[in-house]
Amino acid sequence: MRYALLIYASEQEWANQAEEESQAQFQEYMAFTKDIVDRGIYKSGEALQATATATTVRVRDGETLTTDGPFAETKEQLGGFYVVEAKDLDEAIEIAVRIPDVRRGSIEVRPVMEIDMPS
């Protein structure tokens, strides 16, 4: 089964990291990603730009409304994600606890819906 591992942490903390800490964390992410690729469980993943670059889109009464930034202000922001293949939730959690930002933020583990798309 595929699981989305959604990485939440404080953008403020990311921005205030010392350069050495930032580089060390980047290397941790590269090692983690290489490991899950080598194990054949990596399906996709991306880092996201800061919430200041986001636009939220809604349609109300047929009118398209856009707002700069995320829809909800929270202490932790979605900073990236991985999609991995795991046999069950326990294995997905075992993978999630190795993501570097789990030590300062949180990782939401969510099963991906399996939908057969028509050809």
Feature map (PLM): residue ranges:
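Conserved, structured core segments of small domains
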Residues: 1-119
